[in-house]
């Protein structure tokens, strides 16, 4: 995946992670978890996974 694609995915994953942390709605949690799984299944390369994880963590830290 290109770095641009990874950045876009990281932003979306950070948004979804924020929803998971803040919602009490079990249906919303389930749909959000499914969307996260769908997105992360698109990444096959280990280096891309690590880079994506670091990007998401950075974005989540900036939110705090």
Tell me the role of every PLM-derived stretch.
Residues 18-19, 26-64:
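Short, charge-rich amphipathic interface segments used for partner binding and complex assembly
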């Amino acid at each position: 995946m290109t770095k641009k694609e990874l950045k876009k995915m990281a932003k979306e994953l950070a948004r979804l992670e924020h929803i998971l942390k803040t919602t009490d709605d079990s249906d919303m949690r389930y749909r959000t978890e499914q969307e996260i799984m769908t997105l992360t299944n698109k990444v096959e390369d280990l280096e891309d996974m690590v880079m994506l994880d670091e990007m998401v963590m950075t974005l989540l830290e900036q939110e705090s």
